């Protein structure tokens, strides 16, 4: 099942046009390699000798499923994704293995990644197609709270120059979770959202596409911080009851695209429920994302998040 945003079938909206872009965001849920290189508890946990028994075979099974998913999107939209924003990535080496050892090696993807100060050792990253664009400027925005750097993911920004010379600013986020309680953690998510607004204000750009796992739903107060700066393309989907994660039979929408107001009429967001990424709920009717582990037990899926897609229809003299 595939959910469509804004009442428009993206499949028939001309996404194969050379003047359009297909942008994906996906939280890959603990995308670690199988080697314990001594960089933290999560690195040890997700290793061949760790508690999860995260072996080379299991790692490459996940890599193959990620590649298959992107190829599925390529079939659906008439072109492989031009930009893929990712969350919960251990390091650049994981992405190199993904691109070199799966069917993605046939495509010209390049990596933008920087290590962050996240306490779990996970980062955000960008994959982009070299034939479609190149980065002109890359920067990080570090969220601060009460004068101290948050031990969370940095916000990754890349100013991308498209093949025709036009520019678009890509921003990838993974805001602090609700671990420890929603109210206790709210101030940290507010701080991350404030950092996002500060970054956007510094760009003086009207072609911003921000994406990420915001660990908040579109009606959360934190999104008021960016009112007037970015438009939340996920809001109509959320109002319909759609979501990207599912808990106790209920969908929640925490993965989103936020765009410059000038782009709102030329972009559409979709939640991808790719059949082989879904599994039946055991206690509730319906499907849920097929994750890699159920508690400590390996079950062979990819992530507890559905990927999301933004189709960006540039048109004549659009940017």
For each predicted feature, which ranges?
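Beta-strand-turn-beta hairpins that frame and shape the catalytic cleft
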Residues: 16-23, 32, 132-134, 151-176, ...
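Second-shell loop/turn segments in exported
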Residues: 49-59, 80-86, 113-114, 144-146, ...
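N-terminal, active-site-proximal structural segment of metallo-dependent hydrolase catalytic domains
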Residues: 11-102, 112-116, 122, 194, ...
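Metal-dependent phosphoester-hydrolase catalytic domains
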Residues: 13, 198-208, 216-319
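Extracytoplasmic, non-cytosolic globular domains
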Residues: 113, 156-238
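Active-site metal-binding loops of divalent metal-dependent hydrolases
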Residues: 28-31, 89, 175, 213-214, ...
């Amino acid at each position: 099942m595939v959910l469509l945003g804004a009442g428009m079938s993206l499949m028939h909206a001309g996404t194969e046009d050379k003047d359009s872009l297909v942008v994906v965001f996906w939280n890959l849920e603990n995308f670690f390699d199988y080697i314990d290189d001594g960089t933290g508890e999560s690195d040890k946990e997700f290793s061949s000798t760790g508690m999860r028994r995260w072996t080379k075979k299991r790692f490459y099974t996940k890599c193959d499923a990620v590649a298959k998913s992107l190829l599925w999107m390529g079939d659906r939209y008439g072109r492989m994704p031009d930009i893929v924003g990712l969350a919960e990535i251990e390091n650049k080496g994981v992405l190199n293995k993904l691109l070199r050892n799966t069917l993605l090696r046939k495509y010209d993807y390049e990596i933008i990644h920087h290590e962050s100060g996240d306490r779990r050792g996970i980062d955000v990253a960008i994959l982009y197609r070299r034939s479609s664009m190149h980065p002109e400027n890359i920067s990080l925005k570090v969220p601060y709270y009460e004068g101290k750097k948050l031990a969370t993911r940095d916000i990754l920004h890349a100013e991308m120059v498209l093949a025709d010379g036009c520019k678009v600013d890509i921003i990838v986020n993974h805001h602090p979770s609700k671990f420890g309680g929603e109210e206790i953690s709210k101030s940290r998510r507010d701080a991350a959202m404030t950092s996002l607004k500060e970054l956007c204000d510094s760009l003086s750009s009207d072609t911003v596409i921000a994406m990420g796992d915001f660990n908040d739903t579109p009606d959360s107060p934190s999104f008021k911080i960016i009112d007037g700066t970015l438009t939340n393309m996920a809001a109509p989907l959320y109002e319909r009851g759609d979501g990207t994660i599912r808990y106790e039979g209920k969908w929640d929408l925490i993965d989103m695209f936020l765009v410059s107001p000038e782009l709102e009429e030329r972009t559409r967001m979709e939640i991808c429920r790719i059949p082989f990424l879904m599994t039946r709920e055991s206690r509730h009717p319906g499907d849920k994302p097929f994750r890699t582990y159920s508690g400590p037990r390996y079950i062979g899926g990819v992530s507890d998040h559905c990927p999301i897609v933004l189709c960006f229809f540039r048109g004549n003299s659009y940017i």
